[in-house]
């Protein structure tokens, strides 16, 4: 019996060591991809143009402007410009409600699919792709049924599928319309426990160049980090970032990362800061709000952020 227990113990230990080695190697590969990106930034785009008007209407978030609107952990922003309308992320539906929270809010706010030209999925996490079921299936959805998106441009961070449509995975930066740019595939090491499934992940960021304002970044979670996103935007667009809207994944508390982000945006003298409550807690958001004053805008479902 003792011999059996010893053998079993060694086998279990061997399995644990082997798994640790595999996980370590995969994390190392993921970090190497991030390091390569930092060493070889993407090429600059020429003549990106500008939009005259930009309004960002949150359709799903962890805060709401009215009891008539649903809220939850996740993101869904309607980016409205004179060059086109883009839905950034498709929210989260953990209770499998039909209609989903984001679909309910679209009805309440008078938004239809006909209003949307492009679907822009920032990264492949359940709270940005409509729920765990769709995430597991390598796709995304607005609700419990995948609605017809034929004829719409669909931009995804990695190769995803969608019935009746052909999503385009992020690659090099590209101009989507005059003044609207997808900054391309920005790698990051995924967060635990999702990192156990796929350590290396991609997030894409939307950049909108607004006349007389400058470049506004629209972020889903900000996993690559604010500094990397700002540096990428300025390398690609050749002009300074003037604002940031969306997730920055600072978590709870006023951390060193929060202070570094504030300092970076102060250096840029930004015109707009709006942090998502789904991945930055009240203390961090309050620190940004206190620093930037009138330039800071809370994010809540149904509360439009009018840039120009």
List each language-model region with its residue ranges.
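Active-site metal-binding loops of divalent metal-dependent hydrolases
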Residues: 61-62, 90-93, 124, 159, ...
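Membrane metalloprotein/metal-transporter helix-bundle signature
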Residues: 95, 127, 154-162, 247-252, ...
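Zn-dependent metallo-beta-lactamase
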Residues: 4-83, 173-199
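A short helix->loop->beta-strand "cap" motif at the edges of active sites that frequently abuts
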Residues: 84, 142-155, 268-273, 294
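Active-site metal-binding motif and surrounding structural segment of the metallo-beta-lactamase
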Residues: 98-153, 237-245
């Amino acid at each position: 019996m003792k011999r059996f227990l010893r053998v079993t113990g060694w086998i279990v230990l061997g399995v644990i060591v082997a798994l640790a080695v595999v996980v370590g190697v995969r994390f190392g590969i993921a970090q190497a991809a991030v390091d390569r990106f930092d060493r070889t930034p993407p090429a600059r785009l020429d003549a990106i143009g500008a939009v005259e008007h930009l309004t960002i209407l949150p359709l799903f978030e962890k805060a709401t402007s009215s009891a008539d609107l649903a809220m939850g952990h996740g993101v869904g922003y309607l980016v409205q410009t004179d060059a086109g309308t883009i839905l950034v992320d498709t929210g989260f539906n953990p209770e499998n409600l039909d209609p989903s929270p984001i679909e309910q809010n679209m009805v309440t706010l008078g938004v239809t699919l006909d209003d949307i030209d492009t679907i822009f999925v920032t990264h492949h996490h359940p709270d940005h792709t409509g729920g765990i079921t769709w995430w597991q299936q390598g796709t995304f959805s607005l609700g419990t049924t995948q609605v017809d998106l034929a004829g719409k441009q669909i931009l995804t961070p990695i190769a995803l599928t969608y019935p009746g449509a052909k999503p385009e995975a992020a690659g090099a930066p590209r101009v989507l319309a005059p003044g609207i740019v997808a900054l391309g595939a920005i790698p990051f090491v995924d967060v635990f426990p999702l990192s156990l499934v796929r350590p290396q992940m991609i997030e894409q960021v939307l950049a909108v160049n607004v006349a007389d304002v400058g470049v506004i970044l629209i972020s889903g979670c900000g996993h690559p980090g604010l500094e990397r996103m700002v540096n990428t935007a300025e390398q690609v667009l050749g002009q300074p970032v003037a604002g940031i809207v969306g997730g920055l994944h600072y978590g709870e508390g006023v951390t060193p990362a929060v202070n570094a982000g504030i300092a970076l945006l102060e250096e840029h003298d930004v015109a707009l800061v709006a942090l998502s409550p789904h991945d930055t807690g009240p203390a961090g958001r309050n620190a940004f709000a206190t620093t930037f004053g009138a330039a800071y805008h809370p994010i809540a479902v149904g509360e439009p952020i009018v840039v120009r």
